Amino acid sequence: MAIALYMDVHIPQAVTEQLRRRGVDVLTAIEDGATEVPDDELLERATQLGRVLFTQDIRFRAMAQDWQHQERLFAGLIFGHQLGGTIGQFVKDLELIALASDSDEWRNAVEYIPF
């Protein structure tokens, strides 16, 4: 019943490390060799892997909304505003999301954190 997360290249490593300590399945774009991949390809890659993308890049939010209007499938997007939360808040919210939801709930969904 848990979801897997895919971290955009700009997410602090501390978020990934703390989530892994809590048992959350996390893959970073860096680990996946996707550090210089265009945004649309990164969202597509996360979708191919069945992972919800977490980003702080506002361009992803607009792109995901465009994909929703086009009915183009993606695995889900979680947007964390850079000035809107601390690492601890992001970890807490992402852990809750990852462990309490499933991939079907996230299909073509966009969510904003911190809550």
Predicted regions and their residues:
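Short, surface-exposed connector motifs at secondary-structure boundaries
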Residues: 1, 24-25, 48
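Acidic, PIN/NYN-like endoribonuclease modules and their adjacent C-terminal/linker elements
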Residues: 2-9, 13, 17-21, 34, ...
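Conserved BB-loop
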Residues: 25-37
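Acidic, metal-binding active-site segment of PIN/NYN-like and related structure-specific nucleases
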Residues: 39, 47-64
